[in-house]
């Protein structure tokens, strides 16, 4: 189950245990994994962190 969030970040939900989340971004043919292992309790904080990671990745000039 994958859904778009904001600023190019998507959330992949894994229905196991506490409901893990993986944050990712599709940049053309590249799949960028931003953060793995978040659960519902830390979701908003981890989304903000994933957005920061994606911004940093783009600033570094990655494709």
Regions found by a protein language model. Give the residues of each.
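Enriched for short, Lys/Arg-rich terminal
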Residues: 17-21, 25-63
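A short, surface-exposed loop/turn module that caps and links secondary-structure elements
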Residues: 1-16, 61-62
